[in-house]
A protein has these predicted regions:
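Nucleotide-activated chemistry modules centered on ATP-dependent adenylation/adenylyltransferase
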Residues: 1-266
């Protein structure tokens, strides 16, 4: 049902006119660490509202860097490193403010996808595509759309998965470069909010096993994975639990229930 208007704190941002001027001159925008902006705004909103907690949904997969061998992380402001640094900043400067933490930090993207696959009432309406966000659509042309499809592919029948995107994402050969980056075949992971190569390898391995058992013809990108992949799938990912988190004890039961489901053998 949500909250009534009088219970909502509305915070607005404006674009610096100087940035618009630079854009008109041909300069490109840098990356905006949006999650860090949300962190500071939420801490302020929580303080004036008297809230005890500011709860995020950032997963452990956000900790991985984008460039192999380098500590360059497109998702730094979603990582545990940022969460810890922000908590230290909060404790040092605003000790009475709400506690800032992610309730999904113990879990990886694939575990979250397994949990979400059960909530079919939301499959037609959820979105996780930056390019299509202004139109509330899946663009079906970006690494993010491809990654989400890969994460859900072990847990949904092909027809249900394809109905979410309006197409078979694993058949889109024009996304081979992004696909190879997601799989770890190259040293560069797409600069999008996507999970780890290990998760992608496991997800596609499970999906390939499902196709082989059913006798269905594999889509092009899944065949490409089977032909090119040399990495062993880490099946322990679905039973993993990342201890690097700042979740208060009072939420232990919520986290425990999710862990019991995602770690259970199918």
């Amino acid at each position: 049902r949500g909250y009534s208007e009088d219970k909502i704190i509305k915070i607005y941002r404006t674009i610096d006119p100087e940035l618009l001027k630079r854009n008109a001159e041909g300069f490109l925008n840098g990356h905006t660490p949006f999650s860090s902006v949300v962190a500071f705004i939420s801490m302020y909103a929580g303080f004036i509202e008297g809230a005890n907690d500011v709860i995020l949904s950032n997963e452990s997969s956000a900790n991985e860097s984008n460039i192999g061998g380098e500590s360059v992380n497109h998702q730094y402001s979603k990582s545990f490193e940022f969460e810890r640094d922000f908590d230290e900043f909060r404790r040092r400067n605003f000790p009475q403010s709400a506690v800032y933490f992610s309730l999904l930090r113990p879990f990886c993207e694939l575990q979250i996808a397994k949990q979400f696959s059960q909530y079919k009432q939301y499959h037609a309406i959820f979105r996780s595509c930056n390019r299509g966000s202004k139109k509330n659509i899946w663009c079906c042309e970006c690494p993010k759309c491809l990654f989400v499809a890969i994460m859900l592919s072990p847990f949904l029948p092909p027809d249900e998965l394809n109905s979410i995107f309006g197409c078979d994402m694993l058949a889109k050969t024009e996304l081979e470069t992004d696909f190879d980056g997601l799989c770890g075949f190259t040293g560069l992971k797409p600069f999008e909010c996507v999970g780890t190569a290990d998760e992608v390898v496991l997800a596609l391995t499970l999906t390939a096993e499902k196709y082989k058992k059913s006798g269905l013809e594999m889509p092009a990108l899944l065949r490409r994975f089977c032909e090119k992949n040399t990495a062993c799938a880490d099946y322990s990912l679905l039973s993993g639990f990342n201890e690097e988190n700042l979740i208060p004890k009072k939420f232990d039961e919520c986290v425990k229930r999710m862990f019991e489901y995602v770690s259970a053998a199918d």
